[in-house]
Structures are given as structure tokens and as C-alpha cells.
């Protein structure tokens, strides 16, 4: 918005040359981060008071850790604050004509809406289950598949009209069309190795990345500050990849696919980092507010969508290794418990408790130890992911 305003002012008043600074992506990214940070810090106390007045408190389940019982009643649905800061900051600082930022914003809001309904049912309607699993996955699938169908052609073309034309040609040709190499699965640490996916392969991969990332972040969000800091670190790292793939110079030099327009995603990533740090101010132990599903599902989906656009799905799995392991721990625990119950008549556990962060608490780690150690691991994994920029 401000970029368009600056460009318009320059056309009517050429002497306002200093407004050219708005054309620099790095400047706007810095401003987006600062704007989101300030919005989060200033609006945070009001949002928390409002949540308390509405009695939107986090219910603690009976089988939860004993040390967590004191958290009962802590305001939840604080993810609204994160989404508010991201939305306002991004709209102020990004190029409004950029379709990639719009699709990430819409996916984020879509998954945020799903999480909002889930949280509302839990804390307001007093339904301990919230949205039923099938219902939740249905709506996640709807949003994820719509995004995947748009992105499969959007990455190939720089015009929305051409995207629509490609989609219609795909339908008329019997759902068979070749995608350019840059739409393939990029293998990290390998020089210019990209496995072709085809339309169906791309759509399936995109769906799995977006929905999987969303639920993985949601499963990780179980301790004060545990999920938000890794989201900030992974999101910031993806912003670097967006900057590279959006630049014809850097992408050519680093042997990355050039995806025109993807650089603007740096604005969204910066806003996500700023809003995340602001939220951490209130979410650090002992937390004054929890993000809830409205925040966790939305942020996870945003990370997945950005990774797909910049063709870094595997790198996302590396940098977000904590999210991956947390999700796997739940799947393994459930699968093993059902298998042993069917075979031996009594269910057995692989972990003392799942997700994995609760297992470490059961092993004697304090909550703050688990959180900070997971942060350190994420920081190291992000460095590994960023090293793929050059180590190829």
C-alpha cells in the first residue's frame, strides 16, 4: 500500500526523490518487521484483557502434566493478535499487485479461521473436542487443495491471466500438461537437481506440505514459547530463500530457480517474525496468553505455503525439524498403541507422553529447559538449511 502511494507521489512530485527508498525490498521488509512488532506490543495488553473479559481461557485436560494445571484459565486464541499484526503490516508494506503474497495471506487467514472455530467451540461452547478431526481435516483439505491448484500454474507464469489460461488448457487436455523444471522438487545440497512432479504430483506434495506443516506446528504448541520462536526462525530463513529466488541475479549465481515475484514474500516473512517476537513477549514462561489453534494452524500453513512457492519443501522439513519430530512422535505413539492393543490386548507406549516435549517433561526436564533446548536445535537446523544456499 505504501509502495503504491510512494510511487504515485513521485509521479506528481518528482522532487520527492527520497521516496525511492520504498522500492528497496530490504527496506520494506525491515519496516514490516518493525511495524508488526510495534502493533503486537501495543495491542497485546488490550487483546489479553479482552480475552480475559470474554472468559476465553485455556482448558487443561485431566491427563495433562501436573505442572500444567496452574495454566488453566490462561487466555487462549492469542493467535488473533499475531494474525492482526501480520495482516496490517504486510498490507502496508508489500506490493499490492503481487499474487504470491496474496495467496499466502489468504491461506493463512483460511487456516486461522479453521483454528478460530476449533478454539471457539472448546473455550466458549465448552466442547472439549472442538471441531471433530474429520471436519477439521476436511476444511484444511479444501483450503490446501485450492492453494495447490493455483500455485501449480502460478509458479510457472507471471500473469494471473496466463495462470487461468494454463488451468483451462490443462482441463481441456485431459488433465495432462508438462510443468517447467522450476516446478519440480528441488533437492538440497545437489547442484541443479530437480525431480519433475507433474501436475498431480505437485498438487499432492503442496497439499501435504501445507496441511502437514499446519498440524505439525499446532502439535508443537504445547509449552510456553515453544512453537512461536521456531516459527520466527524458520520463517525468517524462508524469507532469505524468497529473496534469492525472487532475484534473477542471486538465483542465477546460487543456481536456484528464478521465480519472479517471490521476493515480495520477504515482506510477509518479516512481518511474521516481528509479530512472533511481539507475541513471545506475552507468551514467554509463565505465559500471559496462548496462541491457540487460530495462531498455530495459520502460522504452520503460512510456512508450508511459502516453502512451496520458493521450492524449498525439503529444506522446510530440515529447518522445521522440531515440528516434524513432534508430529512423528504423535503418529508413532498412536500407531504403536493401537497395534499393541490389538495384538496383546493392552496398549503400550513408545514415549512416556506425546507430543515429544511432554516426554522430556516426564523424564525430568523443566518446561523452560525443554523450550530453550528446542529453540537451540531449531537455530542449528536453520543454519543447516541456510547452508544449502551455497553448499551444493
From Swiss-Prot:
Main location (coarse class): membrane
Membrane-traversing stretches: 28-48, 76-96, 100-120, 137-157, 193-213, 225-245, 262-282, 289-309, 314-334, 369-389
CDD domains membership: GT_MraY
Gene Ontology CC entries for this record: plasma membrane
Membrane topology of the entry: Multi-pass membrane protein
Domain of life: Bacteria
Cofactor: Mg(2+)
Disulfide-bonded cysteines: none
Compartments where located: Cell inner membrane
Gene Ontology molecular functions: metal ion binding; phospho-N-acetylmuramoyl-pentapeptide-transferase activity; UDP-N-acetylmuramoyl-L-alanyl-D-glutamyl-meso-2,6-diaminopimelyl-D-alanyl-D-alanine:undecaprenyl-phosphate transferase activity
Catalytic activities: UDP-N-acetyl-alpha-D-muramoyl-L-alanyl-gamma-D-glutamyl-meso-2,6-diaminopimeloyl-D-alanyl-D-alanine + di-trans,octa-cis-undecaprenyl phosphate = di-trans,octa-cis-undecaprenyl diphospho-N-acetyl-alpha-D-muramoyl-L-alanyl-D-glutamyl-meso-2,6-diaminopimeloyl-D-alanyl-D-alanine + UMP
Gene Ontology biological-process annotations: cell division; cell wall organization; peptidoglycan biosynthetic process; regulation of cell shape
InterPro entries: Glycosyl_transferase_4, PNAcMuramoyl-5peptid_Trfase, PNAcMuramoyl-5peptid_Trfase_CS
Record-stated family: Belongs to the glycosyltransferase 4 family. MraY subfamily.
Chain's role: Catalyzes the initial step of the lipid cycle reactions in the biosynthesis of the cell wall peptidoglycan: transfers peptidoglycan precursor phospho-MurNAc-pentapeptide from UDP-MurNAc-pentapeptide onto the lipid carrier undecaprenyl phosphate, yielding undecaprenyl-pyrophosphoryl-MurNAc-pentapeptide, known as lipid I.
Protein name: Phospho-N-acetylmuramoyl-pentapeptide-transferase
Organism from which the protein derives: Polaromonas naphthalenivorans (strain CJ2)
Amino acid at each position: 500500500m505504501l509502495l503504491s502511494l510512494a510511487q504515485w507521489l513521485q509521479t506528481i512530485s518528482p522532487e520527492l526523490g527520497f521516496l525511492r527508498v520504498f522500492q528497496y525490498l530490504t527496506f520494506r521488509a525491515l519496516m514490516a518487521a518493525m511495524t508488526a512488532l510495534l502493533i503486537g506490543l501495543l495491542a497485546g495488553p488490550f487483546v489479553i484483557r479482552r480475552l480475559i473479559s470474554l472468559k476465553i481461557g485455556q482448558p487443561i485436560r485431566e491427563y495433562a502434566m501436573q505442572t500444567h494445571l496452574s495454566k488453566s484459565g490462561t487466555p487462549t486464541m492469542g493467535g488473533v493478535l499475531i494474525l492482526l499484526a501480520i495482516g496490517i503490516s504486510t498490507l502496508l508494506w508489500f506490493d499490492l499487485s503481487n499474487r504470491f503474497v496474496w495467496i499466502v495471506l489468504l491461506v493463512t487467514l483460511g487456516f486461522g479461521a479453521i483454528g478460530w472455530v476449533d478454539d471457539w467451540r472448546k473455550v466458549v461452547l465448552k466442547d472439549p473436542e472442538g471441531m471433530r478431526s474429520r471436519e477439521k481435516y476436511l476444511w484444511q483439505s479444501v483450503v490446501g487443495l485450492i492453494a495447490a491448484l493455483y500455485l501449480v500454474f502460478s509458479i510457472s507464469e507471471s500473469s494471473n491471466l496466463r495462470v487461468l489460461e494454463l488451468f483451462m488448457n490443462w482441463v481441456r487436455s485431459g488433465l495432462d500438461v508438462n510443468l517447467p523444471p522450476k516446478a519440480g522438487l528441488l533437492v538440497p545440497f545437489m547442484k541443479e537437481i530437480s525431480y519433475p512432479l507433474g501436475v498431480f504430483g505437485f498438487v499432492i506434495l503442496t497439499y501435504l506440505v501445507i496441511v502437514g506443516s499446519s498440524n505439525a506446528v499446532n502439535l508443537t504448541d504445547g509449552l510456553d514459547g515453544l512453537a512461536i520462536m521456531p516459527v520466527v526462525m524458520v520463517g525468517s530463513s524462508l524469507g532469505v530463500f524468497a529473496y534469492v529466488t525472487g532475484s534473477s541475479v542471486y538465483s542465477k549465481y546460487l543456481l536456484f530457480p528464478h521465480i519472479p515475484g517471490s521476493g515480495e514474500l520477504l515482506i510477509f516473512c518479516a512481518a511474521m517474525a516481528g509479530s512472533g517476537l511481539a507475541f513471545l513477549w506475552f507468551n514467554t514462561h509463565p505465559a500471559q496468553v496462548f496462541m491457540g489453534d487460530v495462531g498455530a494452524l495459520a502460522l504452520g500453513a503460512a510456512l508450508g505455503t511459502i516453502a512451496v512457492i520458493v521450492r524449498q519443501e525439503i529444506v522446510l522439513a530440515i529447518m522445521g525439524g522440531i515440528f516434524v519430530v513432534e508430529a512423528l512422535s504423535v503418529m508413532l505413539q498412536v500407531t504403536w498403541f493401537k497395534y499393541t492393543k490389538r495384538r496383546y490386548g493392552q496398549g503400550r507406549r513408545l514415549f512416556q507422553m506425546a507430543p515429544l516435549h511432554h516426554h522430556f517433561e516426564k523424564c525430568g526436564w523443566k518446561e523452560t529447559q525443554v523450550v530453550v533446548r528446542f529453540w537451540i536445535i531449531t537455530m542449528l537446523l536453520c543454519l543447516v538449511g541456510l547452508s544449502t544456499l551455497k553448499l551444493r
